């Protein structure tokens, strides 16, 4: 509501020290989806990432809530790319370009389109520095998903070779 209505227009009021509804409001899933933001499979543990992914599928399929999850820049497991659940995921491409060869190879086998594609232009949390995934966290499955050797992985602060809007558009075609 805060993005659409001013504070005075919100359908809530405080009465006797409690927040009360002053008029009917639609359930949150009628308004917009809930999104689990960018968390790569390399940054989280595999089990944690897969647990969130399973929760996203469950909340959509069993509860009817429009929940989406962004893959983070580390790519996605092929079994998810080729599943019906891909429609709940936003595939991210970021400055490290990790996992994109695998995603491109999986495209002919995808049963559905992803919920979206997120193009991360720069590292917002670490502007000018980029990010590092320590070698210790680059397990075999991370190497397979990202198509990289076991080494510390650097994600540059921006897309190398993209210095203008025109260059960005050319890369997307």
Feature-to-residue mapping (PLM):
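N-terminal capping/small domains of soluble enzymes
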Residues: 1-160, 167-172
